[in-house]
Amino acid sequence: MSEAAAQPPFEIRTVAVIGAGAAGRGFALACAGAGFHVVLEDVMPSNLRRAEADYADLTAHTAAGLLELALTVEDAVRAADVAVDFVPDELESKLEIFSMIDRMAPPKTILCTPSYTLSITDLASCVYRPERCVAVRGNLLHGGSAVPPTVRLLYPVAAAESTLAAVGWFLRALGIEVRRELDPDVPSLIKNTVL
């Protein structure tokens, strides 16, 4: 069985998506379309209504019953295997969301952020489960492109292999190729020791 098809030791079935703006909404719908149970959270009811309308179009084809809407992070992450935040890429916003997810989600939950500018090492250092933190850099929405996108899966030194395997499997299930990389913001001395 190939690595892409092999199930990781930790299986992702329920995805919490925090933030129902355009990117979060699109990612949530892609996850539901791939057969994952998704709980989409946003504090703005209008964003959730838009997601519900988009989802109604999708359910006619494939994903009936796979999307739930939530107005609180606590409700969204209650049973999540992975929580992916789509809040603004600002340190204070990301730290607040990571802290909330860390407090409210079950210990098994992986924290994932599609950050282009922030260090996953810095974010992971502020939670009780740094071994379950990753960042994704690249396009998580490929819109049926013939060429699947490749994203960088960035991880802190503390990341567990099971976390990387599970997130890699999850992203490949969405049609996204994955290239693992130790967080480039890790100091060189530590990188050399780890590698």
At which residue positions do the language-model features occur?
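NAD(P)+-binding Rossmann beta1-loop-alpha1 motif at the extreme N-terminus of oxidoreductases
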Residues: 2-61
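Structured loop/turn residues at beta-strand edges in well-structured enzyme cores
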Residues: 10, 77-78, 128-131
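Structural motif
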Residues: 18, 41, 70, 86, ...
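Short glycine/serine/threonine-rich phosphate/pyrophosphate-binding segments
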Residues: 24-26, 92-95, 118-120
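Short amphipathic alpha-helical segments
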Residues: 28-30, 52-53, 95-98, 123-125
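Rossmann-like NAD(P)-binding element
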Residues: 43-46, 50, 60-110
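Rossmann-fold dinucleotide-binding core
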Residues: 110-181
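Helical "substrate-binding/catalytic lid" subdomain
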Residues: 173-174, 182-195
